[in-house]
């Protein structure tokens, strides 16, 4: 990429890099990926190599099963949109930043295969607003006063069942 004076490095991370979620390893790994994109963007800017992190919403994968969660195909469409549809101006502004897949869907017009009327995208977009507002706060990941979350306190019944390692023993 440096030799070609052009490139795009994309990382897929998680909101778990901003708040405590699951465990220490999960949060630290995702915070490191977010920071790595920022640092690479800083160092590689003069070589026209951009680094961007994308944050999918809750997912539907072989490991998690959030109701109406984003499919791997949806996340793949976000990657393709950045590679094929985003212009240089957009990529320059996104360089070093963390972007939500739902914001990319809204901008570039992709959706889940089953979302025939766009209502799933709209619900996800509305649902992402509190997370984006929290990200605007100064270092929200360093709020140690709130204590650790209790998965039993969530308003989503069965939340702990979504993660095999989440239930207390």
Region locations from a protein language model:
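Residue-level detector of anion-binding/catalytic polar loops
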Residues: 50
């Amino acid at each position: 990429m440096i030799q070609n004076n052009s490139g795009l490095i994309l990382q897929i991370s998680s909101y778990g890099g901003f708040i405590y979620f699951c465990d220490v390893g999960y949060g630290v790994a995702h915070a490191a990926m977010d920071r790595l994109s920022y640092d690479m963007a800083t160092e590689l800017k003069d070589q026209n190599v951009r680094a961007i992190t994308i944050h999918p919403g809750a997912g539907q994968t072989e490991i998690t099963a959030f109701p109406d969660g984003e499919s791997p195909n949806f996340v793949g469409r976000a990657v393709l949109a950045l590679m094929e549809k985003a212009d240089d101006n957009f990529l320059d502004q996104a360089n070093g930043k963390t972007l939500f897949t739902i914001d990319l869907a809204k901008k570039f017009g992709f959706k889940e295969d089953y979302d025939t009327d766009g209502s799933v995208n709209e619900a996800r977009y509305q649902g992402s607003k509190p997370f984006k507002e929290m990200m605007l706060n100064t270092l929200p990941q360093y709020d140690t006063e709130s204590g650790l979350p209790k998965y039993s306190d969530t308003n989503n019944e069965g939340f702990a069942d979504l993660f095999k390692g989440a239930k207390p023993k």
